[in-house]
Amino acid sequence: MAPKKAEEVVESPPVSSEEEESGSSGEESESSAEVPKKVESSQKPESDSEGESESESSSGPEPESEPAKTIKLKPVGTKPIPETSGSAATVPESSTAKRPLKEAAPEAIKKQKTSDTEHVKKPITNDEVKKISSEDAKKMFQRLFSETDEIALLQGIIDFTSTKGDPYEDIDAFCIYVKKLIDFDATKNQIVTKLQRLKKKFNNAVKNSLKKGKTEDDIEFAKDLEQKGFELSRKIWGSNGVLVTGKSSRKKVGGTPAPKEMKLVAHSTPKKQQEEAKKPERTEAKVVNTGLSIGKEIASFLNADNGSSCGLDESTLTAVWAKVADGAEKREVEEKWKKLKAKQFELCLQRSGLVNETAKMIFKAYES
C-alpha cells in the first residue's frame, strides 16, 4: 500500500503547472514562486518511486496502477489553487461589500424626507375647500345684532334719553350704557351704524304703509319681535318720538339766513319790486329748512308776518302739536308739509337762476 501513496504525490506538479498557465497573469506571479519548490520536492519521490516501481513491476501488474493515478491527480492538483484564489478574491469582495452600505444611507435619508413631506403636505380635496369657503362666507355675512339685541338697543335709547338726554350729543356715554344690554362687545361704529339702519328701516316701513293708504297704527308684522321693535322705533323716531321732539325743542327760533342772491335782488330792483320780493323772502327763508318740526314751521310763519302780536313761541306750538293724536290726518298734514318744502326748493332754484340773469344784465348796463 505504501508505493500507491507515493505515486499520487509524484504526478501532482505537472497538473498544477497546466492550470496555472491557463489562469490569470496575477495568479501566475503569485504561484510562480511556489511552483519550483513543489517541483523540487516532487522530483525526489519520483526517483524513489521509480526504484520501487521497477521492483514491483515483476510482482504486480502495471495497468491497474495507471488508472488510479489519473483519477486521483485532479483533486490533488486543484487543492492549492482555490486557496490562493479564494484569499485573493476575498479582499475585493470585502471592499465592494462596504460600498452598497454607503450608497444605501443617502437613499434611506431620501425616503425619510419624502415620507415626511408626504405626511406634512397632504392634498386638499374639493370637499374640504367647499367647507372652508362656506365657513368663511358664514363668518362674513354673520349677523352681529340679533333681534333681541335690536330691541335692547331701542329700549336703551328711550331709557337714556329720559335720564341723561340725547344720545347723539354724548355718544360715548351712550355706547357704554348700551354695551351692558347687548350680548356681545360692540364697538362705537357698530352701534352708530345699527342705529342708522334701524331708523331707515322704520322710515321705509312708514312710507310703504302711507303709499298703501295705511297709517302707523295699521302697520303689523308677522313676528312678535319685529312688531315690538317697530313700536319702540315709533316711540323714538315717530311724530311724537323722543328724539324728534327733543331736537325741535333744542333748536333756536328762526331759520337759516336768506341767500345772498336774495339780498342782491333787493338792492338792485326798484322800490316796488323790493316790497314784493321782501315778503316772500322772509316767509320762504323761514320755511325752507328741512330740519324744522311742524310746530316750529307754524311759529316761524306767524312770527315772520305778525311779529310778537300772536304771543305764540316755538316751544308752546311744538308741545301742542305733540299732543295731537297720531293718526291718518296727522300723517297727511306732515306729508303735505314735505311736498310744500320740495316745491319751495324748486322755487328757490328758479329764483336764484332769475337773479343771476338780472345780475348779469345790470353788470353789463353798469359797464356801458
UniProtKB/Swiss-Prot annotation:
Q: Know the name of this protein?
A: GLABROUS1 enhancer-binding protein-like
Query: Where is the major localization of this protein?
Result: nucleus
Region described as Disordered: spans on this chain: 1-123
Species this chain originates from: Arabidopsis thaliana
Q: Which family does it belong to?
A: Belongs to the GeBP family.
Describe its assembly. Answer: Mono-, di- and oligomers. Associated with the Mediator complex. Interacts with MED6. Interacts with MED10A, MED28 and MED32. Interacts with DEK3.
Recorded hits in InterPro entries, A to Z, give: GEBP (IPR007592), GeBP-like_C (IPR053933), GeBP-like_DBD (IPR053932)
Q: What is the effect of changing residue 348 to S?
A: Decreased DNA binding. Loss of DNA binding
- Keyword annotations from UniProtKB, A to Z: Nucleus
Q: Which residues lie in Acidic residues bias regions?
A: 17-31
Q: Where in the cell is it found?
A: Nucleus
Q: Name one GO cellular component term.
A: nucleolus
Listed GO molecular functions? Answer: transcription cis-regulatory region binding
